[in-house]
């Protein structure tokens, strides 16, 4: 799954929160000596890290502070997220995942650009808020590392069949889609009867608070839910029936917008489910036709190898280009001299392709040509090329894009479910020693002292 919550966007959100005018993070400079708040295997979480992360969360709720849980509960929720980041970074490093300085610098440049400033300007803003630039770089490196771990997990374990896409496409063209929210009170694997009873009491208390109008569903989700998307108000996005577990699908069809059902017992614990709104799938999918430009071209490739060094390859491609300029037939030269075994026998014919099919640089050279013209030699990762553009056409890619979007949605749902199980296992296997006080109960419900990486029965998904 290459599409995931965009790494640059997620980092940008984290950074932009730092700049909001709430209780200043620079106050941290005047705090006593830093201390450890959690030991995570061979790593630690420092109080300063926790304070910065809490500051970022609170920045997102300026003007809506009442939706946040009490400070001591929020502290434990955020600490658990930091613990999971430490565990994921450690696992990524064990798996050989490394973030190069070039990749890190590019990500930071993108963050600065999206904040309409330079890297130096970003550095100055961070320092003004009491955050050192090396600490910021490390946090960005960790975010990218976790992204690569998740990406590798998806590529190795997540498969979406064409049959699944066909079924979902048929469902999307008829029927309804449902916008859902949920609240989860987690029950650990192998829970005792006492743990189950405590969870039942907590979910009943949450339902009572909502029914009495003391808290809106969204606020209750932020305050009490054990789901990883609690701080997003438990929003599950839009779901078609095939994306809703069978145990809930029939129930959802009978619900009215605004209705709340539960508590419901699932594999991860007790849930409350709210139907926010319903929309027609066909209307949601409808839209203008999506057209794309495709190009027809031939090319000649001279590879760079241990035996054929850069200078030798460049001299060879220059000679071939001179032959074509002197009147030699492009197809004949390609058959005789191109080192692309996939198409040299066809005179270098690449067929019809979108501009990004062979990389952005290759596509840009093709787009810059007029039909019939031949490019000057240019370099790519594969070697040295000459390209002749033969034609262009407009192709309707609406259906293809719909299938790609549905495939991505299914893959994202599978990834959420599978990765949350992976995080739960990672957390249970780790040595974690918390060195902060347990929060007191709030609203007479068992507090969400720790937000485990529990897989909700309805995992959060990318919204359409």
Curated annotation (Swiss-Prot):
EC number in record: 5.2.1.8
UniProt-listed InterPro entries: OMP_Chaperone_SurA (IPR050280), PPIase_dom_sf (IPR046357), PPIase_PpiC (IPR000297), PPIase_SurA (IPR023034), SurA_N (IPR015391), Trigger_fact/SurA_dom_sf (IPR027304)
Region (Disordered): 439-464
Cellular location(s): Periplasm
MF annotations from Gene Ontology: peptide binding; peptidyl-prolyl cis-trans isomerase activity; unfolded protein binding
Biological process, per Gene Ontology: Gram-negative-bacterium-type cell outer membrane assembly; protein folding; protein stabilization
GO cellular component, as recorded: outer membrane-bounded periplasmic space
Signal peptide: 1-25
Protein's UniProt keywords contain Signal: yes
Keyword line: Chaperone, Isomerase, Periplasm, Repeat, Rotamase, Signal
Catalytic activity: [protein]-peptidylproline (omega=180) = [protein]-peptidylproline (omega=0)
Domain called PpiC: residue spans: 175-277, 292-391
Keyword Chaperone (UniProt): yes
Entry domain remark: The PPIase activity resides only in the second parvulin domain. The N-terminal region and the C-terminal tail are necessary and sufficient for the chaperone activity of SurA. The PPIase activity is dispensable for SurA to function as a chaperone. The N-terminal region and the C-terminal tail are also required for porin recognition.
Function per UniProt: Chaperone involved in the correct folding and assembly of outer membrane proteins. Recognizes specific patterns of aromatic residues and the orientation of their side chains, which are found more frequently in integral outer membrane proteins. May act in both early periplasmic and late outer membrane-associated steps of protein maturation.
Protein name: Chaperone SurA
Organism this protein belongs to: Xylella fastidiosa (strain 9a5c)
């Amino acid at each position: 799954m290459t599409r995931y919550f965009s790494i640059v966007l997620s980092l940008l959100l984290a950074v932009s929160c730092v700049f909001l005018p709430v209780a200043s993070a620079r106050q941290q400079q005047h705090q006593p000596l830093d201390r450890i708040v959690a030991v995570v295997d061979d790593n630690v979480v420092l109080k300063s890290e926790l304070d910065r992360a809490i500051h970022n969360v609170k920045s997102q709720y300026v003007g809506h502070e009442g939706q946040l849980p009490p400070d001591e509960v929020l502290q434990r929720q955020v600490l658990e997220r930091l613990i999971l980041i430490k565990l994921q970074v450690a696992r990524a490093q064990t798996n050989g995942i490394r973030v190069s300085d070039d990749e890190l610098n590019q990500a930071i440049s993108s963050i600065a650009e999206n904040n309409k400033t330079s890297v130096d300007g970003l550095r100055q803003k961070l320092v003004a808020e009491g955050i050192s630039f090396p600490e910021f770089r490390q946090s960005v490196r960790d975010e990218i590392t976790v992204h690569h771990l998740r990406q590798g997990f998806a590529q190795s374990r997540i498969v979406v069949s064409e049959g699944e896409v066909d079924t979902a496409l048929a469902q999307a063209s008829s029927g309804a889609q449902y916008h859902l929210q949920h609240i989860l009170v987690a029950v650990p694997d192998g829970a005792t009867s006492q743990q189950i009873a405590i969870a039942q009491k907590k979910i009943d208390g949450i339902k009572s608070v909502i029914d009495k109008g003391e808290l809106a569903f969204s606020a209750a989700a932020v305050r009490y839910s054990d789901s990883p998307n609690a701080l997003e108000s438990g929003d599950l996005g839009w779901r078609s029936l095939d994306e809703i577990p069978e145990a809930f699908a029939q129930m959802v069809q009978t619900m009215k917008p605004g209705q709340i059902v539960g508590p419901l017992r699932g594999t991860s614990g007790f849930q409350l489910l709210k139907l926010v709104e319903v929309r027609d799938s066909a209307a949601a999918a409808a839209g203008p036709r999506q057209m794309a430009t495709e190009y027809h071209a031939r090319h000649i490739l001279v590879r760079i190898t241990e035996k054929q060094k850069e200078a030798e390859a460049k001299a060879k491609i220059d000679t071939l280009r001179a032959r074509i300029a002197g009147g030699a037939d492009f197809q004949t030269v390609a058959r005789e001299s191109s080192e692309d075994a996939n198409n040299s026998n066809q005179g270098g014919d690449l067929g019809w392709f979108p501009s990004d099919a062979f990389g952005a640089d290759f596509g840009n050279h093709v787009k810059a040509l007029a039909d019939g013209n031949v490019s000057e030699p240019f370099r790519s990762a594969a070697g040295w090329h000459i390209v002749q553009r033969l034609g262009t056409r407009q192709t309707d890619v609406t259906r293809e894009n719909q299938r790609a979007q549905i495939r991505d949605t299914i893959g994202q749902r599978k990834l959420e479910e599978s990765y949350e199980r992976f995080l739960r296992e990672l957390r249970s296997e780790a040595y974690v020693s918390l060195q902060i006080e347990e929060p007191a109960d709030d609203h007479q419900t068992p507090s969400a002292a720790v937000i485990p990486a529990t897989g909700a029965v309805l995992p959060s998904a990318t919204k359409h």
